[in-house]
């Protein structure tokens, strides 16, 4: 059954805007789980612009579903993951100047190093997922690192303005799902998904989990986090 990982980064974004202690992402995770979240996702960025080390450490103790730690494949972040031991990590690219993650990681440019990263993390029983574009060469490289998962980048699909473009990008995602599954990879997806566009991605073959954040937190400002999560679960089933 398709599951929902709720990304709570933007609860921390609001907190960090005033450098205060509220709202607390840890409390948000509890509410998200009450609302039906199947997992909690946080991105500990190198610049600590939203989620802080403290958040991840407490979430590791309090999350009752599973904790997905998004992070860059750097020595600092690997050390943190090995210490905290999230349920799994999703390795993502980072640029200091970006507002949000702009695309999938390039598996080909640092393939040998990425293989070593996967080996270190999975030797500590931390499954690894790569956040990548739905490109066959990238998917094959991700599989060759020994990772258990990939997360397909849905940003281009989410941002497409024309229906014909959306359908073409959806086809690319579908083919990526099928190819990844044929290689033994488990498939997640995320980035830019909203209540209005999620259903088509939820219907893709062999999809396991969707990681969604901004649209849920935006909705939560108006209706509360529990309801916002429940509504996303409905949207994923085409019932909203």
Swiss-Prot record:
GO terms for cellular component: cytosol. This is Pyridoxine 5'-phosphate synthase. GO terms for molecular function: pyridoxine 5'-phosphate synthase activity. It is found in: Cytoplasm. Pathway: Cofactor biosynthesis; pyridoxine 5'-phosphate biosynthesis; pyridoxine 5'-phosphate from D-erythrose 4-phosphate: step 5/5. Catalyzes the complicated ring closure reaction between the two acyclic compounds 1-deoxy-D-xylulose-5-phosphate (DXP) and 3-amino-2-oxopropyl phosphate (1-amino-acetone-3-phosphate or AAP) to form pyridoxine 5'-phosphate (PNP) and inorganic phosphate. GO terms for biological process: pyridoxine biosynthetic process. 1-deoxy-D-xylulose 5-phosphate binds at residues 9-10, 45, 50, 100.
């Amino acid at each position: 059954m398709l599951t929902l990982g709720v990304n709570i980064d933007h609860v921390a974004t609001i907190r960090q805007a005033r450098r205060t202690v509220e709202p607390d992402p840890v409390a948000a995770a509890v509410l998200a789980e009450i609302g039906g979240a199947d997992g909690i996702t946080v991105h500990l960025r190198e610049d600590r612009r939203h989620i802080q080390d403290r958040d991840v450490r407490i979430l590791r103790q309090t999350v009752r579903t599973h904790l997905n730690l998004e992070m860059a494949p750097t020595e600092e972040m690997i050390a943190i993951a090995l210490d905290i031991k999230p349920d799994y990590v999703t390795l993502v690219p980072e640029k200091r100047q970006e507002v949000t993650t702009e695309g999938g990681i390039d598996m080909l440019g640092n393939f040998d190093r990425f293989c070593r990263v996967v080996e270190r993390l999975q030797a500590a029983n931390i499954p690894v997922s790569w956040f990548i574009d739905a490109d066959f060469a990238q998917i094959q490289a991700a599989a060759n690192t020994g990772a258990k998962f990939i997360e397909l980048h849905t940003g281009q699909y989410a941002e497409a303005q024309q229906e014909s473009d959306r359908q073409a990008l959806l086809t690319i995602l579908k083919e990526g799902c099928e190819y990844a599954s044929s290689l033994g990879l488990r498939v997640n997806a995320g980035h830019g998904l909203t209540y209005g566009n999620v259903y088509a991605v939820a219907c893709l073959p062999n999809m396991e989990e969707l990681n969604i954040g901004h649209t849920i937190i935006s909705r939560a400002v108006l209706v509360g986090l529990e309801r916002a999560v429940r509504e996303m679960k409905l949207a994923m089933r085409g019932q909203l």
